Amino acid sequence: MDQVVKIRVILDVEEDIFRDIEIELDAPLMHLHLSTLDAFNWDNANEMASFYQSNEAWDKGAEYPLMAMGPEFPSMENATVRDILPTPTSRGLYVYDYLRMWCFYLEPLAIGAAEDGVGYPRLMMEFGTTPDPMSREPEGLDDAGLFDDVFSDDAKTGDPEIDAYLDEDDDETPGMENIDDHVDLF
């Protein structure tokens, strides 16, 4: 008989927000991914995500991304719930939307036999009001100096010849600001 695990999926926010989901241990991680989004009412969300094996300190272990980087790599399609939660004391992480970095903690509450006639996965408990998945600002994009090095006028390469070339004045031709200023060159 198939085994099911009851997982507490805790959203990492200031308020207490979690969902308890029952799912078969041998179900693909894709089923847990979709049922987690559905349980948190993020079913219209279409961002990248990954599951990770974890430990008591919630460190990231082996990664199971939404899409594999190649046929020999694991993904949510070819890995199972058992891969991230191999024992009753295992822990897992789920990261959704790499720009907004929504992090969920996964803890198994119980493992038992599947009930006949019951469809899995299924939502067993809801606690807390889920925020909108777009309510969090993307991380790292609000840094005022993020692109200073890329778009700096005084960018230096470290090579004196190249730096001298880059420092040459572009306005050697008087009154020429842009090539478009002289459309009748030919």
For the regions a protein language model found, what residue spans apply to each?
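Short linear regulatory motifs enriched in tryptophan with gly/pro/ser
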Residues: 1-186
